[in-house]
Amino acid sequence: MNHTSNNSPCFSTRGLAIGSMVAAIYVVLTLIFQPISFGAIQFRIAEVMTLMPIMTPYAVPGLFVGCLLANWLGGGIWFDVALGSIATLLASICTRRFREKPPLAAIFPTIFNGLIVGPVVYFAYVRAPGDPVSVPTLLFNMATVAFGELAVCYALGLPMIYGLKKLPAKLFEG
């Protein structure tokens, strides 16, 4: 008997397990590489996981939860935790949408993190309260976050995805 809501596999035990594993791997990678995972210039190795929606829809909520937990456990302030997780969620949804074209799908984490996380890093951690906004510094933060994301997604993430595509698809199904 199927005990899922509306017979949707999105709520299957296996789907929940897959999403949970994605979240756990994201958290562990972020915290193991903490010195390079946070800050104005970041190279978050865990972002390889942002390409997992290419393989399975269960990665989308898993990445949201994983990013939320990693940012919280990493000591982020509330709007960094919230907005960083939203950036990851938006990127995951778009990555899933373009899953048939992995090189194109890999650009979405770069775009959303550069546009959302870059300003968050600037306003939360770089700019002192009361100081005027420095547009060059803001743009620098956006660029460094985007560049780190681009490097991780294309240099590490795409090879990971192409390797995973050689495995049986049933491994990623709920």
Regions found by a protein language model. Give the residues of each.
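Hydrophobic transmembrane alpha-helices
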Residues: 2-61
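Membrane-embedded alpha-helical hairpins and interfacial helices in multi-pass inner-membrane proteins
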Residues: 35-40, 48, 68-174
